Amino acid sequence: MTEVLLLPGTKSENSKPPHIVVFPFPAQGHLLPLLDLTHQLCLRGFNVSVIVTPGNLTYLSPLLSAHPSSVTSVVFPFPPHPSLSPGVENVKDVGNSGNLPIMASLRQLREPIINWFQSHPNPPIALISDFFLGWTHDLCNQIGIPRFAFFSISFFLVSVLQFCFENIDLIKSTDPIHLLDLPRAPIFKEEHLPSIVRRSLQTPSPDLESIKDFSMNLLSYGSVFNSSEILEDDYLQYVKQRMGHDRVYVIGPLCSIGSGLKSNSGSVDPSLLSWLDGSPNGSVLYVCFGSQKALTKDQCDALALGLEKSMTRFVWVVKKDPIPDGFEDRVSGRGLVVRGWVSQLAVLRHVAVGGFLSHCGWNSVLEGITSGAVILGWPMEADQFVNARLLVEHLGVAVRVCEGGETVPDSDELGRVIAETMGEGGREVAARAEEIRRKTEAAVTEANGSSVENVQRLVKEFEKV
């Protein structure tokens, strides 16, 4: 586990601890990093109230156990929405198509939150809320506290989203789209734009509320990013210019801080650990596509055949994916299929793992980068095409192996790319991945590391409000 330089707490003997309220968006990739930040604030002497709905309360259990006197859950009933079935309170229950209706549902919590704030004996001095909850900017103006937007995504993606929402007519009428205002002037096919952009614009009329919500983020008093200056300084400077101030805090990768919040976060199944221990350093390809995506039978067949042809050692984590009959027997000794939950970060950081075949979700990207693994990207939806562009073309720590949520890869080509990347042909990208790993680790561990200094700046900003 990476050692973390903790900053002095803000609590004094004669004053109450500062009280912050945190409002995560109920999707694993959004919620867990913000809870990691909450943990760091508690370590520095803050009291934190976390707004959740009943179906998401279980995510707070590790945090409540770690900080029983500092963390309070504020539970509001989940407001209904005609597009959501009863009981749906998290994106994992419906997939990325649930983002917009869940965003709409949570807007209905405005008045209950105001009532809670006004009746609290020690009301919070600031709000940290997810970037999908941009409407909380106006809420904070009404109750008179600053709002800090939390971004569990890259600066690159924020730049792309802002351009798209400010140029709706261009996006709807042009393909590919040339984002001239952005650093490096990237070009994207319409199908590779973030899913929330395409869904916002595919309705009979644009989802103006969601577009407004995102635009509100640029007006927030401050912004906190789970990224690193090492990874995308040009887009950091672009976003700061758009925001018009320096209250932008780049504090990640949060997965490198070693929060200890996720249950068994550092443990690996003994049988898997034994298999990894018996593998040569850097020889294993870890294959996982996140918590939401399940591959089709055709995709699984092609991936399995590609792995088989590559002759590469691998660990393939699956949920309900239909693994071909006989595959596990044919790769016995060289490959493992693991069903269910795996401590991804712990596996990636094992010395035997040298590559990561990933959907390129941002949290997985950060875990891969901080582990020094070469990423073999198969972006499918959401922000993943943007993230893959950053990894492959900007950072040089990844190669693309496939694109698209419905695409079936050519197994011969897939096997060839895997073998080449995990072998001699991947030495250059592996060296680059290790260089970036060292730099991002220094950002969160060294006294003058950029992320360490940004956390200190954030704490001081809270002390001023």
Swiss-Prot record:
Cross-referenced Gene3D superfamilies: Glycogen Phosphorylase B
Alphabetized GO MF terms: UDP-glucosyltransferase activity; UDP-glycosyltransferase activity
Membrane spanning stretches: none
Keywords: Glycosyltransferase, Transferase
EC nos: 2.4.1.-
Sites where the protein binds UDP-alpha-D-glucose: 291, 342-344, 359-367, 381-384
Highest taxon listed in the record's lineage: Eukaryota
InterPro entries with a match to the protein in the record: UDP_glucos_trans
Protein family (similarity comment): Belongs to the UDP-glycosyltransferase family.
PANTHER family in the cross-refs: GLYCOSYLTRANSFERASE, UDP-GLYCOSYLTRANSFERASE 89A2
Described function: Glucosyltransferase that glucosylates benzoates and benzoate derivatives in vitro.
Protein name: UDP-glycosyltransferase 89A2
